[in-house]
């Protein structure tokens, strides 16, 4: 394993509104009210599906090198899936939300406003959207598309165990591999593009301060100004 300093600490994510203090009745009523507001906009939202869940992850990490780390992370997640139908034509939208913290997440998400906006967009798409002529063109991508591309096409290929072949039979290999045309320092994109894996963003769903090997979290610049900059390592791959 790569050498790391031992650490003794405990950390947690605070809740401004404790999830455990919110009754099941309040949780259900919150989403029933959202559904009521959504269906009173004069838009034919033919189907709606909402899901909501909470968790509290408590971890106690200890290793033979002297590290002792305890943590408590409450998380809250929700998603909405709606179908709008106009003149017999359906369009669908899916919105997902995640937060490390307490019930205050719902105040920040503004679920009702976001789902109503999605319904209005779908209605407009059905009524006004025009087919695009085939061909090459410049596109401006929204966060939904850009996020998927960053995660799937940029994030997974930078996993060092995948790069070294450990994931090949289960989840596929990477376009980056030893002896290949792409490696650290190789330019593969525009200087305007930098992609960062950052688990230290406060209240993000994937937030953590120390990982499951006891390593302090930090932003990792996978691609910097269009250049392959660093990989996602565990202690085993970091030692190679």
Label for each model-derived stretch:
Residues 1-219, 224-227:
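Active-site bordering "gate/hinge" segments
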Residues 227-240:
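C-terminal, non-catalytic macromolecule-binding modules
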């Amino acid at each position: 394993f790569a050498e790391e300093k031992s650490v003794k600490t405990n950390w947690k994510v605070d809740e401004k509104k404790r999830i455990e203090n919110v009754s099941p009745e309040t949780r259900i009523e919150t989403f029933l009210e959202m559904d009521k507001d959504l269906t009173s906009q004069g838009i034919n939202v033919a189907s709606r599906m909402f899901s909501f869940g909470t968790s509290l992850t408590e971890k106690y990490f200890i290793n033979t090198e002297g590290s002792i780390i305890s943590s408590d992370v409450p998380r809250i997640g929700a998603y909405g899936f709606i179908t709008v139908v106009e003149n017999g034509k359906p369009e669908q939208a899916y919105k997902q939300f995640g937060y490390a913290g307490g019930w205050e997440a719902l105040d920040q998400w503004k679920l009702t406003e976001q789902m109503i906006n999605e319904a209005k967009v779908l209605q407009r798409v059905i009524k006004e959207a025009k087919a695009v002529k085939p061909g090459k063109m410049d596109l401006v991508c929204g966060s939904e598309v850009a996020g998927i591309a960053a995660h799937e096409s940029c994030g997974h290929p930078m996993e060092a165990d995948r790069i070294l072949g450990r994931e090949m039979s289960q989840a596929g290999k990477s376009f980056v591999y030893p002896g290949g045309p792409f490696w650290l320092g190789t330019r593969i994109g525009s200087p305007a593009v930098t992609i960062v894996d950052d688990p230290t963003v406060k209240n993000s769903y994937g937030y953590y301060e120390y990982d499951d090997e006891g390593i302090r979290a930090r932003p990792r610049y996978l691609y910097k100004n269009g250049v392959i900059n660093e990989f996602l390592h565990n202690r085993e791959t970091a030692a190679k």
